[in-house]
Amino acid sequence: MDKKMFCFQCEQTVGCTGCTGNAGACGKKADTARLQDELTGALISLARAVDGSTAISKRTGQIIIEGLFTTVTNVNFDDVSIENMIQKVRAEKERLVPDCSKCQSPCGKTDEYDMQQLWDANEDIRSLKSLILFGIRGMAAYAYHANVLNYEDAEVNRFFCEALFMIGYGESVETLLPTVLKVGEINLKCMALLDKANTETYGIPEPTDVTLTIEKGPFIVVTGHDLRDLQLLLEQTEGKGINIYTHGEMLPAHAYPFLKKFSHLKGNFGTAWQNQQKEFDHLPAPILYTTNCLMPPKSSYADRVFTTEMVAFPGAVHIDEKKDFTPVIEKALELGGYKEDQILTGINGGTKVTTGFGHAAILSHAGTVVEAVKSGAIRHFFLVAGCDGAKPGRNYYTEFVKQTPSDSIVLTLACGKFRFNDLELGEIGGLPRLMDMGQCNDAYGAIQVAVALADAFGCSVNELPLSFVLSWYEQKAVCILLTLLHLGIKNIRLGPSLPAFLSPNILNFLVENYGIAPITTPEEDIKALLNHSK
């Protein structure tokens, strides 16, 4: 069969083998996929041009981060935008090694890496390189969000080059495997950097109830992950009679004190990303996409889709780095919003959700938690976290949370929580049984809680009554998984399906060394996880 493209970086890839037709499962066209490969090849060549430098300039680092972020699933569907990014990468390489373009001798500095070499490689080499590539793509998103708040880490920037070089020129399992785990190590630093950036800029998240009711009148829906974009929009809409509602991974913004002070930040609209084409259908308001996940818009709302930062879609109005949101504001006033209040619900019928249980909030009750564990009031902790998606089988996570014992605590983060975050699970000792820790990058906070509990009980994280039940969809989930592996976390349950880019040998390595297992049924997995912790 003639392959029009090849991509297997997301959980929904066709047949759990790879998208090869005229378009991917995510909606990107084959031409777009080929441009993403060309961009990745250019980035590998730029990393080669850096040639082991210990001091990556801020400019070079930012270009690499932007290029990697552009290739994350559901970020950029616009070929012109990607072509411009490719030229930006090539221009930076020319700036670093200007004589290379004049040289007639082929070498790694003059030739761009052809991604077909990776896709055609030995399956174990391809698997390890894919883990590195998809991991640093996810990590680039976190680095980007930190950078826009003027936080950066030279070690993180330097590692992007190191990892890209290994993708292009690493030749053995023995050399690639340490880099896979180092992605997890550096991603931990990157998530810590973003946690610092967010909390020092917007304050420590506080437990906060968020309504799902949409008030009548003009409003704007903000989706994605970028808190700075939300801040700027709130500032530009203040006093204009326009309400702002979060969507998807922007929900945790309600917990930050700086953002909470805006009275027109009203609540949350809708559920997770994969439901947007239904939920945004004929929406009487504009939608601002700050990051993934963007799905190709339906005609019923395409005229009210606005993108910014690295997000782009053909025909959508893009808000550039000047951050003048006037077109979005004018569209909100033109559409006018709903004529009456709309009482919406979560997937399970709840009319509100709660967020803001970051690591600081939970650890402020550390004494209560430790005593509850010692007394037997809390028997187990479940971290049920990760991405949501459209693939059948994800209702597993709803049923899993529903069936967790009444003497257990459920921690959650990322958009997978929309499967169950409107459930009322009650309390233990004044603490809610279900605690939303934030966005996917707030996995850093979950790690801090786990480490603090292990210290309190004088044991390792693996010896805690704590189980990781994860869902994945895109590349940020990959870098988080690699961070957990770097920390030695074992017996993770992963679903709804295992990554197509894991070869049998590499998967077997993860099973034998880390006990990774696919999800089965909620009943069987809960029983097995509780028995394992005894």
Q: Where are the language model's segments positioned?
A:
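Anaerobic metallocofactor- and corrinoid-dependent redox/one-carbon enzyme cores
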Residues: D2-T32, Q36-D37, G41-S45, T54, ...
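Electropositive, gly/pro-rich neighborhoods at or near active sites that engage anionic ligands
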Residues: L43-T201
